[in-house]
């Protein structure tokens, strides 16, 4: 549909997927790709059976086992009876409804938001949904991707559509280039630190600027992955040659002339020069330093060369009270140097930072410590995001770099990102984690989570505390 009014990328994606927009009703959008897993799909399948409905387009749905599985064993019951029941249910449901499943031990199994891109299931210009809040990851490709609830999972199963109200638009521009050693995780944590944990509520965010354009696809995924952590419905990055090169040749991606024509279309998938956004935020890349969260939401973050803030540093009474609560839960004292905070657990993994580039970066830091071992009082685990990532890392010898230094090398899965499997922290454990959420109890009851980059996590494992790698 052509229009004389300049449009944002989000508005273009919305318009091309709009099925119905009846006055007084919630608009209806077409869904191109539906990713499912064992946790948010059982009730949706049960309702389909109750109403005797088929999955309308099973070929547009892909299932994987990721949240509840053990990363120590491929046995379906290794993470407990409850998890095993959900995993068995997924296998039965996929068979009954004709949905392709990457189950335990399958060469394509992995975290949904890792396997989608690496297999070419994630494509620019599409709408992608999943019953998981970090579906925004796929926005790195210029796809409108967002998490949905179980009732919405059922709606997509039955109709391949979804009712959605149109969001507001926000542009976040990161000007210039980041300094040496600054990662994509640092960029997104710095953004969240500036906006606060609810700063983009009600918006779809488009990331742009030289610092964003310079990122690899895997780094862009890290940025978009955490869009929900400051309230955004979704995060978008305009597709470019970096995107096209990444997608080309992937197993499920278009091939030959079909791919070439797709690229022609994808090149137009960007915000028009004069498009108006409802909100604009600008950051200077050179000001971004390595980040560490100190509190109990991702917005409570500071550079590693800083100190734990005091409640008196906040003028807003809500933020002041939040700081008091966070310091109490985290067992921290205001004024403590971030580099003086010691950890006893390290987790490198999750849909935020478990791809091959993340593992290479972490291994590179381990090598810089020239034979030093993980501190004896620390348990450190490396969890690749998929079997393909695992195999690639092993072919490069990364697993040996980690295990020789005292890290555990695990099987793919969501693992310690969330307390939903057998990788759970105990009360009082303090973890340097490459995941995306540091809420109270997120990694286990009473657990204390500090969100960091893979590089920072690896350094913390070797030294026992947070390190300013650029000092």
UniProtKB/Swiss-Prot annotation:
GO terms for molecular function: 3-isopropylmalate dehydratase activity; 4 iron, 4 sulfur cluster binding; metal ion binding. Its cofactor is [4Fe-4S] cluster. Keywords: 4Fe-4S, Amino-acid biosynthesis, Branched-chain amino acid biosynthesis, Iron, Iron-sulfur, Leucine biosynthesis, Lyase, Metal-binding. It catalyses: (2R,3S)-3-isopropylmalate = (2S)-2-isopropylmalate. It is an enzyme of class 4 (lyase). Its EC number is 4.2.1.33. GO terms for biological process: L-leucine biosynthetic process. CDD domains: IPMI. [4Fe-4S] cluster binds at residues 351, 414, 417. InterPro entries: 3-IsopropMal_deHydase_lsu, Acnase/IPM_dHydase_lsu_aba_1/3, Acoase/IPM_deHydtase_lsu_aba, Aconitase_4Fe-4S_BS, Aconitase_4Fe-4S_dom, IPM_dehydratase_rel_enz, IPMI_cat. SUPFAM superfamilies: Aconitase iron-sulfur domain. Disulfide bonds: none annotated. PROSITE patterns: ACONITASE_1, ACONITASE_2. Binds 1 [4Fe-4S] cluster per subunit. Pathway: Amino-acid biosynthesis; L-leucine biosynthesis; L-leucine from 3-methyl-2-oxobutanoate: step 2/4. Belongs to the aconitase/IPM isomerase family. LeuC type 1 subfamily. Heterodimer of LeuC and LeuD. Catalyzes the isomerization between 2-isopropylmalate and 3-isopropylmalate, via the formation of 2-isopropylmaleate. This is 3-isopropylmalate dehydratase large subunit. It comes from Colwellia psychrerythraea (strain 34H / ATCC BAA-681).
């Amino acid at each position: 549909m052509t229009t004389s009014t300049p449009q944002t990328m989000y508005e273009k994606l919305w318009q091309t997927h709009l099925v119905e927009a009846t006055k007084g009703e919630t608009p209806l959008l077409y869904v191109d790709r539906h990713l499912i897993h064992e946790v948010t799909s059982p009730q949706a399948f049960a309702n389909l059976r109750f109403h005797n409905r088929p999955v309308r387009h099973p070929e547009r749905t892909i299932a994987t086992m990721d949240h509840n599985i053990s990363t120590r064993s491929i046995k379906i019951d290794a993470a407990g009876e409850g998890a095993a029941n959900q995993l068995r249910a997924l296998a039965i449901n996929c068979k009954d409804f004709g949905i392709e499943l990457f189950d335990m031990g399958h060469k394509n199994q992995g975290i949904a938001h890792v396997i989608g891109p690496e297999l070419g299931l994630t494509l620019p210009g599409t709408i992608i949904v999943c019953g998981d809040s970090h579906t925004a990851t796929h926005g790195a490709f210029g796809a409108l991707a967002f998490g949905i609830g179980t009732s919405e999972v059922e709606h997509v199963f039955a109709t391949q559509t979804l009712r959605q109200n149109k969001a507001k638009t926000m542009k976040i521009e990161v000007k210039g280039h980041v300094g040496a050693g600054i990662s994509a995780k640092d960029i997104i944590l710095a953004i969240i630190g500036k906006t606060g944990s609810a700063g983009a509520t009600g918006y779809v965010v488009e990331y742009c600027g030289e610092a964003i354009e310079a990122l690899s696809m895997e780094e862009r995924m890290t940025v978009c992955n955490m869009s929900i952590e400051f309230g955004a419905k979704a995060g978008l990055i305009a597709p470019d040659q970096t995107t096209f090169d990444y997608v080309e040749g992937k197993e499920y991606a278009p091939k030959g002339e079909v791919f070439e024509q797709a690229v022609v279309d994808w090149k137009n998938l960007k915000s028009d020069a004069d498009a108006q956004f409802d909100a604009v935020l600008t950051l200077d890349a050179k000001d971004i330093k390595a980040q560490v969260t100190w509190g109990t939401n991702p917005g409570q973050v500071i550079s590693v060369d800083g100190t734990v803030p005091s409640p008196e540093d906040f003028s807003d009474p809500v933020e002041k009270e939040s700081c008091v609560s966070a310091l109490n839960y985290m067992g921290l004292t205001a004024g403590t140097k971030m580099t003086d905070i010691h950890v006893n657990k390290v987790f490198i993994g999750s849909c935020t930072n478990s791809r091959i580039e993340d593992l290479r970066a972490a291994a590179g830091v381990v090598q810089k410590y020239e034979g030093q071992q993980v501190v004896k009082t620390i348990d450190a685990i490396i969890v690749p995001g998929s079997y393909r990532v695992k195999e690639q890392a092993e072919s490069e010898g990364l697993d040996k770099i980690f295990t020789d230094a005292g890290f555990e090398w695990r099987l793919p899965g969501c693992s310690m990102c969330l307390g939903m499997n057998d990788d759970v922290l105990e009360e009082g454990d303090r973890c340097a984690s490459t995941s995306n959420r540091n809420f109270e109890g997120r990694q286990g009851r009473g657990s204390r989570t500090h969100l960091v980059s893979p590089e920072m996590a690896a350094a913390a494992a070797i030294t026992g505390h947070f390190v300013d790698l650029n000092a």
